[in-house]
Curated annotation (Swiss-Prot):
The lineage of its organism: Bacteria, Pseudomonadati, Myxococcota, Myxococcia, Myxococcales. This is Probable RNA methyltransferase Adeh_4229. S-adenosyl-L-methionine binds at residues 154-155, 186, 209-211. One of its GO terms (cellular component) is cytoplasm. SUPFAM superfamilies: Radical SAM enzymes.
Length: 338
């Protein structure tokens, strides 16, 4: 896949100095159909030559794909420099798919419950490497792909410009044609970039990984709390909600750690008056250090949330793909059996 696959048609037109119409035709070929540049229709050869001269050859190599029992499919890709990343295809309603993309090879944030954190950070992905994950999964899918979540390996807001470039390439009507409202970008709470994202007015859904409402507890789970404290994060959430609408807060539930009555009460105090959606999800920890709550613990936590955050949507996310380590928090860039 060429470097230009990571650009939307307007960016391509500006950088290549070509007409927007030609850029749309090229985007339609490379991203819309997953075809080579030379297969762009109704574009003069001289224009293709100009664009080709700007493109950097490179491709993602599919090393392996494995199917979980519940229909999730995990892909292991090798990047041009030999690094590996994983991508997950998520089935929805037996009619379409959502794709979970990685934005970095590894991650530097060190969240205690996440397998990717144990890898450390090798590098950030380029926009075309993220778009190419989607194109490879699409080529392997009979059902349409109608949504994208930047929730795979890495911290998207520590690769801000490339992630936004990929998101705009994916929602380009000339390319992948994914509704921008169905593209979600998740962050562990990089406050300056949240504020920049809010100020710039992007149309994608913002998701923030919260996981605890007490600073000391969040710091133990997420070292990012040391650099971007909870009070600053909540102010950034409040600002975004006021200007751009409801924020989705992800909450990894860990038995005996963050699902007690006191945790629900702390969430109620922290989020009072802020329009948010809370998405709890059970922890997935292959190491066995952390356990998900059982049904009684979840039910008690849910009821406590209803009391402490009346009117706040609380939607429990399904934790799929566990048997093949395709679930949230389990991506470790390994082949099956490694």
């Amino acid at each position: 896949m060429l470097h230009l696959a990571g650009q939307d048609s307007r960016t391509l037109a500006r950088r290549a100095g070509i007409s927007l119409e030609d850029a749309r035709r090229i985007t339609g070929a490379v991203i819309g159909r997953g075809a080579p540049l030379r297969d762009a229709r109704n574009v003069r050869r001289s224009v293709l030559d100009e664009v080709d001269a700007l493109a950097t050859p490179g491709e993602l190599r599919l090393l392996e794909s494995v199917d979980a029992k519940d229909g999730f499919r995990k892909y292991l890709f090798e990047l041009p420099d030999g690094l590996r990343v994983e991508t997950v295809r998520i089935p929805l309603y037996d009619t379409h798919h959502v794709v979970c993309l990685s934005s970095q090879a590894g991650c530097a944030l060190g969240c205690a419950f996440c397998a990717t954190a144990k890898l450390g950070l090798d590098r950030s992905l380029r926009s075309w490497e993220m778009v190419s994950q989607l194109l490879a999964v699409r080529a392997d899918s009979e059902r349409p792909i109608t949504g994208v979540v930047f929730m795979g390996q890495g911290e998207p807001f520590l690769n801000y410009d490339e992630v936004l470039a990929a998101a705009y390439a994916l929602c380009d009507p000339a390319g992948a044609r994914i509704d921008a409202r169905r593209i979600s970008i998740s962050t562990a709470g990089v406050v300056p970039m949240i504020r920049r994202y809010t100020a710039e007015g992007h149309k994608f859904r913002l998701c923030i990984s919260l996981n605890a409402a007490m600073p000391w507890k969040r710091r133990a789970l997420m070292p990012v709390e040391q650099g971007f404290p909870l009070d600053e994060l909540v102010e950034a959430i409040r600002e975004h909600a006021a200007l751009r609408g409801r924020v989705t807060l992800e909450y990894v539930m860990i038995s005996g750690v963050n699902v007690g009555e006191e945790d629900a009460a702390a969430l109620g105090r922290l989020l009072a008056g802020i329009p948010v959606r809370l998405n709890p999800i059970a922890v997935n920890d292959a190491s066995g250090r952390y356990r998900p709550p059982d049904e009684d613990e979840w039910n008690a936590f849910r009821d406590a949330l209803a009391r402490e955050l009346p009117g706040t949507p609380v939607v429990r996310r399904y934790s799929g793909g566990q048997d093949e380590h395709a679930a949230c928090g389990m991506l470790a860039s390994r082949r099956r059996g490694d």
